[in-house]
From Swiss-Prot:
Any one Gene Ontology molecular-function term assigned to this protein's record: L-cysteine desulfhydrase activity
Family per similarity comment: Belongs to the UPF0597 family.
The protein's name in its UniProt record: UPF0597 protein CLK_1197
GO terms of biological process kind: L-cysteine catabolic process to pyruvate
Any matching Pfam family: SDH_alpha
InterPro entries in alphabetical order: Ser_deHydtase-like_asu, UPF0597
Amino acid sequence: MDENIIINILRKEMMPGLGVTEPASIALSSAKAYEVIGGEIKNIKIIADPGLFKNAFSCAIPGTKEVGNEMAALLGAICGDASLGLECLRKIKKEDVSKAKTMLDKIDIEINSQTEGLYVESIVTTNNGIGRTIIRYKHDNIVLVEKNNKILYQKENTLNKSNNFSQEAIDSKKITEMKLDEIVEFVNNVSYKKIEFLLESIKMNKKLSEKGLEGLGIGLGKLILESCDENNYELYAEALTCSAIDARVSGAATPAMTVTGSGNHGIITTLPLLAIKEKKNLNNEVLARSIALSYIINIYIKEFSGKLSAFCGCAVAAGTGVSAGICYLLGGSLKEIENTIKNMASNITGMICTGGNLACSLKANTGVKAAFLSAKMALNNIVIPNKCGIVSNSIEDTMKNIGRIAYPGMMETDKEILNIMIESSK
């Protein structure tokens, strides 16, 4: 595959995001809908796919102590700046939160279980009329903008008649045409200058981690760091990762560099690699190459599991990605990277997702621990063999199988998780 296609996919899948991306996506949608209509808000209706609804259900809104779909939508309309994309709530003020709290009776949330992939629609009714937006497939991918039933913007190639996926989604799916040896060959041989941009994720996510070490969220990262000696890069990796996620899910007004639409995925696929780099005094080039591998494996799995799923994509998909990156950074061969992925597939695949919330750092810690264990096993010639569980004869089929566990495998599980969450909130 042309290396420029791979690089473009990496660039497209990587972007800054403030807070968990599902409430950010809802806020962006309502911000754009209000932007085109203006006036005094009478009602906001949000229609979302079940996965997006679940992930935003109990997640903190950046810069506030508020949580959930309703507040995300209201704040998007009240103070959101759609030009900032997933950082649309960057300018939030206390008075905006106070205003939103008085308007909770003006919002309706509907779950649309018939959509395929990520979907959020915002219909904002004001004294000036109705503004409407639809976001599809990616958290910031606005495909339709209407004002009083007149189309102001409609994205071309939004639907592909053969499979109902956007052209952008099809581009990322090209990753799944690659064999693992081709992926590793790209990582080894691509010009460093062409992938140096990946280090931007390190700078952004490290700042978020430092914020989390102040004791945000459940304080897991801070707790782990307290027991970490100077040369223990594994515990340091857990601490960096968990503190960044602690900060993110608790509403810290500090962005993460997302990948495959998720800040948590972006954190897990990068910060453990930074921990190794720092403790072993490695150079930036090998770090960038390991991040490229981590990202690509994560993207590969997510193309089969979906952007949002019943399993914890952070621990499973991103965890598998970073396990490959860890093995690479520790000098692993192609075969050892392959065996690392097999070990991950055999371990925590199937860990459930209960949405973006304070438990995310706990699951992330499990994912990072499993990633290091899988790599260490592979580097010591310990591997789960083919035809054992979901490990297939080819590593590509094994990665596909990881995704299949989520979709279609756990679709009914996802529905039940959402039912439990809704019942528990009453």
